[in-house]
């Protein structure tokens, strides 16, 4: 079990981090989405498929141009990650808007401040790079995530909904936004 005091460090992810990122990604989906999406969507997210995905992300594949991935470490162990990149929403300017595509933690560190500080780290870097707005999507019904994002200063945009959850699965997600400047 991880106990997080006030110290978590953040750094860009490397290819060596991919197996742990994939494990956390799968655990995050299990924790956050069980009961909200079809069980088949969860069971098809194998470690092998997640490793393949994260190799593509870190390799800057076509879908992931200009994306960045940061990991959170506690005592040298990766306990979370965040993926961000230019927004592809047609109603925002991608040159000034960053989208947080993923924020997942090892379930053992949830509620200990790591997610908040990792998200702050990503948003601080985006602001320093000239971004003015951040967006992200929350699966409709994921009340824990909605409460978290509201608590850390995000505003819900319930009228902006996407149906794509990834890997060909569709589920409604509502957009959230936060000004960076």
Q: Could you tell me what each predicted segment is?
A:
Residues 126-138:
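Conserved GNAT acetyl-CoA-binding A-motif
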